[in-house]
Amino acid sequence: MPPRQPPPEIDPATRWLWLALSLITLWRLGAAWLLPITQDEAYYLDWASRLDWGYFDHPPGVALLAIGSWLAPASALAGRLGNLLAATLTLWVLIQFYRACGLSPRQQFLVLVVTAATFGGLVSGVLATPDTPLALAWALALHEALVALRGDRRRWVTAGLATGLGLLGKYGMALIGPVFLWAILWADPKALRTPWPYLGALAALLVFAPNLLWNVQNDWLALRFQFGHGFSTTTGVADVATGAVMALPERVSPLAGSGLGERLMAVLSFLGIQSALWGGMILPLLVGLWLSLWRRFPDSSQSPDHAPACDSMNHAVSSGHLDRPARALLVAGTLFPLCFFALVAAFSPVQPNWAILYLLTAVPLLAPVMGRVPRAMLIAALFNLLLVSVYVFHARTGLLPLPDKQQRILYETHGFEALAGEVANLPGPLFADRYQLVAMTRFYAPGLEIGQWPGLFRPSEYLRGRLRPEVDPTAVARAGGFWLLSRDPYRPGIPGFGIEGQRLLYDCLREGLREAFPDRPAPCAAPLHRWWLVRYVPDPAP
């Protein structure tokens, strides 16, 4: 018998790659266990109790990933398990995509670590948000599109399937369409003469169809809300589908009437925030970019006519082993989300996470640049990881003496468990003015009969009669009135009811939840929250 061939030796960089993936996953698991639930997460986890093809704010992807809450309804870790699985799968798909792009094992290792260590990667890998299913579908769509651009045009169908799944996670997945078109025109324009890209679009539409049908049945509720939210426009939700209590308030952009200078500053602010998502890694990245340019043009006396800046930048970011399809997809996937939301930022406020998917393609595109300073990039990545780890620890303990502006995580998470225990014993119907208070108290007290009183603040899924029964003021009056939980001292007038009394609760960092009384000193000097419990009773009959 011929001698058995020894198995091929595994590149040490490949071992480091899979070790990095394992360590990243373990860190995310620990952070998900340590970090208390945040307000929007509690809202999404509540959706999982009533799965549907759509919700007031988003399509159903985030609710589906939250079904771990069925195992332990008051556990943040259980509620995040689906998110953790999807986030880990996203990194695995990205490894396959980066390998297909032509990156070496060393580059794959560096790019994986940097991608996961951006602030976007660290946060989205832990928190249960719609961005997680969106990122997974985006990565899958990029992988399939690359194969299609290289000649197997049938893969536009699978890219379309991934796009449809992404649309079921978050409507921002629609931006992949222009990215694909840009890449096709650059790398394979003849594909537009074949049926495959169009079959891919049809596949996306078919997968997305259940949510479209849900929107049709609910007067385009979620799409109208998101369009108004994204572009600061008044979309109006028809009373036919949702009732008058669901009519959305008029939206006016703070940039309305602004001059060119203010709009330009808004765009620059948006781009600055996107750069800040790199955290400490932005500094070695700039050094690597400078070294790339300096190596390209070491002679400072060279005429600009022979070394245009655009050519030097193109060489700096694309001198790796990227073929035309890979380069087209990476450039389009990076520039289109940034350019699109930069344009939106000139007219309407843009949240930092809306364009965050540009990082999935920007990082491998900049692999040659980062390769000039790999140790510095890894050290900066560890710095980001340490910074977020300390912040997660602070969210759990509140031990760090941070200024008020840096205490947002405590405002998001602290005291709600005690609040839920307090309001669970109140007699009579209970409502809150904001959906966040409803979600947090229902998370910590599963089954708590609390709803959102309509017309006071932004409407939510709680007013649709799915998660909670629709509010019937007549039935509430027959019950003798209700309690209203609010974080505002303002007492809204509610037709048919008057105020009988109120209680004030202080959420103190060290002392916990304490009730305040007019004739006694305040329970603490700087509470994280003040919550009012206002008792409304029916107006006396005429």
Where in this protein do the model-derived segments appear?
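Short acidic/glycine- and proline-prone juxtamembrane loop motifs at membrane-interface regions
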Residues: 120-134
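Transmembrane-lumen/periplasm boundary regions of multi-pass, lipid-linked membrane glycan transferases
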Residues: 176-297, 322-325, 337-339
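Membrane-proximal, lumen/periplasm-facing interface regions of secretory-pathway glyco-
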Residues: 351-352, 376-426, 435-451, 455-465, ...
